Amino acid sequence: MSDEGDVADEAVADGAENADSRGSGGRTALVTKPVVRPQRPTGKRSRSRAAGADADVDVEEPSTAASEATGVAKDDSTTKAVSKAARAKKASKPKARSVNPIAFVYNYLKQVVAEMRKVIWPNRKQMLTYTSVVLAFLAFMVALVAGADLGLTKLVMLVFG
């Protein structure tokens, strides 16, 4: 079974039907149930979060999408007018407003707390493991630097006496 539902099952079972012979022209719709996300992250990356990350994709105007769906082409003049309006909208920058420093700090701290809630914190066993690895690495590096220092000191004393 695939994400495409019964259409894919029928195509596999029949074998003779191809995408061009279907009424939809090879396109199928996928109906999904809304996903209830946990309040706190579980440590697993989900498919819906990756799909939601593409929110900055350009969205077509409804009139353009409707005309393409019905097969009716738009005039060049209306397309040019729409593109000029879009460029004018992008070119006009919002006025710079004065930011209250207290409100800025409050908003910043609110965002920090929100981001800290998203962090997946280690449990006690993981913390002990990470701490012991860091301490072992630190002891190794201290011994390495001390050994290099002692060795180079002896070498300098032998050469320069």
Swiss-Prot record:
Query: Which portions of the chain have biased composition (kind: Acidic residues)?
Result: 1-12
Q: What is this protein called?
A: Protein translocase subunit SecE
Q: Which family does it belong to?
A: Belongs to the SecE/SEC61-gamma family.
Under HAMAP family, the record lists: SecE (MF_00422)
| Subcellular location(s) per record | Cell membrane
Where does this protein chiefly localize? membrane
Q: Where is this region: Disordered?
A: 1-80
Query: Which taxonomic lineage does the organism of this UniProt entry have?
Result: Bacteria, Bacillati, Actinomycetota, Actinomycetes, Mycobacteriales
Organism's domain of life?
Answer: Bacteria
Q: Tell me where the signal peptide lies.
A: none
Keywords in alphabetical order = Cell membrane, Membrane, Protein transport, Translocation, Transmembrane, Transmembrane helix, Transport
**CC annotations in GO:** peptidoglycan-based cell wall; plasma membrane
Q: Which GO terms describe its molecular function?
A: protein transmembrane transporter activity
Q: What is the membrane topology here?
A: Single-pass membrane protein
Keyword Transmembrane helix annotated? yes
> Which segments cross the bilayer?
133-153
Instruction: Output the GO biological process annotations, alphabetical, semicolon-separated.
Output: intracellular protein transmembrane transport; protein secretion; protein targeting; protein transport by the Sec complex
- Record's InterPro entries? SecE_bac, SecE_sf, Translocase_SecE/Sec61-g
Q: How does it assemble?
A: Component of the Sec protein translocase complex. Heterotrimer consisting of SecY, SecE and SecG subunits. The heterotrimers can form oligomers, although 1 heterotrimer is thought to be able to translocate proteins. Interacts with the ribosome. Interacts with SecDF, and other proteins may be involved. Interacts with SecA.
State its role.
Essential subunit of the Sec protein translocation channel SecYEG. Clamps together the 2 halves of SecY. May contact the channel plug during translocation.
Q: Name one Pfam family in it.
A: SecE
Presence of the UniProt keyword Heme in the record:
no
